[in-house]
């Protein structure tokens, strides 16, 4: 099972917000998911990002691949740097 960390679209038409979820890569974008890692609201000024850092690192170490957008969000929050440092120290 290929696991990805990606965005699940929520909210009304023309006013989206997203949940950052861990899901099987074969499941639909807004379909079945394994676990919620955080939220992302691009409409707030500045954009609002809330991520459970421990959960995100756990899934990254398990082998889940983040989507491009999630990778950028994780980088801005410093999670990718912590993941790479933990990987290098082993």
From Swiss-Prot:
GO terms for biological process, alphabetical: translation
Keyword Ribonucleoprotein carried by entry: yes
Gene Ontology cellular component list: cytoplasm; small ribosomal subunit
Similarity comment: family membership: Belongs to the bacterial ribosomal protein bS16 family.
Gene3D superfamilies the record matches: 3.30.1320.10
Protein name: Small ribosomal subunit protein bS16
Organism: Bacillus licheniformis (strain ATCC 14580 / DSM 13 / JCM 2505 / CCUG 7422 / NBRC 12200 / NCIMB 9375 / NCTC 10341 / NRRL NRS-1264 / Gibson 46)
Keyword tags: Ribonucleoprotein, Ribosomal protein
One Pfam family cited in the UniProt record for this chain: Ribosomal_S16
Coiled coil: none
PANTHER family in the cross-refs: 30S RIBOSOMAL PROTEIN S16 (PTHR12919), SMALL RIBOSOMAL SUBUNIT PROTEIN BS16M (PTHR12919:SF20)
InterPro entries: Ribosomal_bS16, Ribosomal_bS16_CS, Ribosomal_bS16_dom_sf
Gene Ontology molecular function, alphabetical: structural constituent of ribosome
Organism ancestry: Bacteria, Bacillati, Bacillota, Bacilli, Bacillales
């Amino acid at each position: 099972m290929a696991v990805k960390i990606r965005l699940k679209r929520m909210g009304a038409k023309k006013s989206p917000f997203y949940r950052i979820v861990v899901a099987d890569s074969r499941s639909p974008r807004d379909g079945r998911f394994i676990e919620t890692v955080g939220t992302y609201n691009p409409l707030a000024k500045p954009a609002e990002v809330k991520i459970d850092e421990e959960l995100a690192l756990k899934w990254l170490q398990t082998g889940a691949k983040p989507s491009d957008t999630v990778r950028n969000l994780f980088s801005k929050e410093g999670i990718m740097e912590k993941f790479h440092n933990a990987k290098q120290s082993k």
